[in-house]
Amino acid sequence: MAGHRPGVRGTAGHRACARGRGVRGGSPSVTEPPPTAPTTAPLRIGNASGFYGDRFDALREMLTGGPLDVLTGDYLAELTMLILGRDRLKDPVAGYARTFLRQLEECLGLAHERGVRIVSNAGGLNPAGLADAVRALAGRLGIPVRVAHVEGDDLTAAHPGTLAAHAYLGGHGIAACLRAGADVVVTGRVTDAALVTGPAAAHFGWAPDAYDALAGAVVAGHVLECGTQATGGNYAFFTEHPRARLRRPGFPLAELRADGSAVITKHDGTGGVVDLGTVTAQLLYETAGARYPGPDVTARLDTVRLTQEGPDRVRVEGVRGEAPPPTLKVGLNRLGGFRNEVVFVLTGLEVEAKAALVRAQMEDAFAVATCRPRHVRWELVRTDRPDARTEETASALLRLVVRDPDADAVGRAFSGAAVELALASYPGFHVLAPPAKGTPYGVFEAARADQGAVPHLAVLPDGRRIAVGPPADSRVPDAVPEPPLPAPLPPGPTRRAPLGLVAGARSGDKGGDANIGVWVRTEAAWRWLAHELTTERLRQLLPETGTGAEGGTGAPGLAVTRHVLPNLRALNFVVGGILGEGVAAQARFDPQAKALGEWLRSRHLDIPETLLDTPEALGGPPDDPHAPPDDPHAPPDDPDAPPKATPEPPPTATPESPPAATDPPEDPR
């Protein structure tokens, strides 16, 4: 991409540039470019990171794999902010994702050579520090790049007792930096989608109230933000694709247009797959209802239309936008105390009696200890099987987790009590690992702050500081009434089978809550799912939601909310409080609810036989001449597996024209 194009690319393609890693030594000469002008030419924007720790080579893969205008990297999650906060306690100049710098050391020259601008939230808690580090790196490599950053999200001083308190900013600060000619923009805490809305707003010259276009970019950004989850990673129907294609999925990119519509795709020749299912799964991930609020716009997920445009190309269009809420989300991270755990292995017969004995023994130890842990949680996991052929499959696990503000309460006294039972407890006593010292854990909470009270600043390459004001208009994102459901399927024979034979799912965490997005791929399956999978049925299938997060008998059920999205043939469930105080508290076996959806898919219920006798329910890996070559030393794929069926394209709908209850539903997501 050496030629000049208007928009966010500015004059990068015309500059003299270093090859590969750049020319070492000397101070690069950075010329002052003219402000970039908006354009209607499509914007090709890719993502090379879905989390701090993602594939290191992805930045280079995306730069060399095909044409790009902008390359983003998402490094921040709720847990990451806590980790960076602890880093900053040890070193005040830390607080950003150092991996990003190592990636730039290898790829900054390549990006400059190709005229690709880089936008990343790797700045974490210290975007100014990362911007300085990038400038120093560029100077050492002799690469004349212009670096800008976005700040103002840090509200820690206003929240005493927190390790890090950061508002989720929007994309307009990023846009200001790009309009000023920045080649690299680093931010602190912005919404994940802002990494796309910012470049898009700069490229197309969108006004702050271009809500439909901004909403389209938000949806595209949400699909891209988790990297390979949009290209076949963590995908419910993964067995329908050849194993060779999924071994190393390529990272996604979006071809954005001036109206906010986009095509989700990936570089030619890379692994993975982009189809209606992979895009739908990611759209449902960590969202909730029809309104998806953000700092710049509230996107209406019930207006999204998806179309399979061709191999590995899904068009996203029709997205409507509304004025953003008057407040910003603020993530509060604090140290919650100290935790420790021990897992007792209970093998063979009388598992319940063995569990009762060791539990009583540990409770006796707590009773005589100088300080009983404030929180004690027992969990018996029945992984054992009768008449098992291996010792592992004959064993159940009894997990004991303790937490307390005082490290001593979960330290040596706790460890010693468990160790002292080695010769004095149930037959076959042993633990998975020797008890260790207590470790600190974090707590995440979400708060709100008025948009006008957060000093959103774009710090341009020349050092000027541009204030980004709050939106001129705002709207509280009230819940959307449930749309009419499709006509139910006529009565017929059913068969007891796992839900996952006909439905996909993806789940994730937001603070202490979890969401489970469930979707189907045919109109008949949607007519069944919309009526069958109610909140009551979900509670039956996932008993943990009905007995409280601690699993105690008689505990009140967790709040479960169902959102209906006919345009995606999907239901999105939000389970409140199932993760306790968030992922860092490690209060649950699966602390980020990553597999909650797969548990749901594994549960059996009565499914119409007409849905089970379909290619979708029988799926298997198809022969694919476009798949990358397989590893010659790997076991072959099943040659007898049935081919994948082409799913029906979903119908379309808008909030203004809901489907009639007796007609096939129109897709609101």
Predicted feature descriptions by range:
Residues A37-P42, L76-A94, H112-R114, D153-G161:
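Gly-rich Lys/Arg/Thr-decorated short loops/hinges at beta-loop-alpha junctions or inter-strand turns
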Residues G554-T610:
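Helix-rich interaction surfaces within compact, conserved domain-sized segments
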Residues V319-R496, K510, N515, W519-W526, ...:
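C-terminal non-catalytic interaction/assembly regions of soluble proteins
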Residues L214, V219-R315:
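A conserved active-site cap/scaffold subdomain adjacent to cofactor or substrate pockets
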Residues V30-E61:
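N-terminal amphipathic/basic leader segments beginning at the initiator methionine
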